[in-house]
């Protein structure tokens, strides 16, 4: 289970982890957060700490820097997993059956 919360305090995410632990205790939780001391991080099996960089929003409120860092970490996880399991264009095409990406993965668009 992959959970993302910069503060580590997002109520819905904390509650989701609690529910997951009750219903599916054997599924490990991976948390990406800017607050490694948060309740969310403390209850996860794996914590990927973003460094807690300040948001570039002039008000310091809107998630900006944190969402970019989380996207990069997520992309790294996906690419690493694709390489590990040998994910192919054919597998990709099965999941993108229409549209531009589906056509490109099947070699219909160059």
Briefly describe each language-model feature range.
Residues 1-85:
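Glycine-rich phosphate-binding loops that contact phosphosugars or nucleotide phosphates
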Residues 56, 83-110:
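Internal, active-site/partner-interface "lid" segment
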């Amino acid at each position: 289970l992959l959970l993302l919360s910069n503060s580590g305090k997002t109520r819905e995410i904390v509650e989701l982890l609690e529910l997951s632990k009750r219903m599916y205790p054997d599924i490990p939780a991976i948390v990406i957060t800017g607050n490694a001391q948060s309740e969310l991080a403390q209850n996860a099996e794996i914590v990927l700490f973003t460094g807690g960089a300040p948001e570039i929003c002039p008000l310091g409120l809107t998630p900006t820097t944190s969402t970019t860092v989380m996207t990069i970490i997520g992309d790294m996880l996906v690419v690493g997993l694709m390489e590990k399991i040998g994910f192919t264009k054919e597998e990709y095409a099965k999941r993108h059956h229409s549209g531009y990406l589906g056509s490109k993965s099947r070699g219909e668009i160059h």
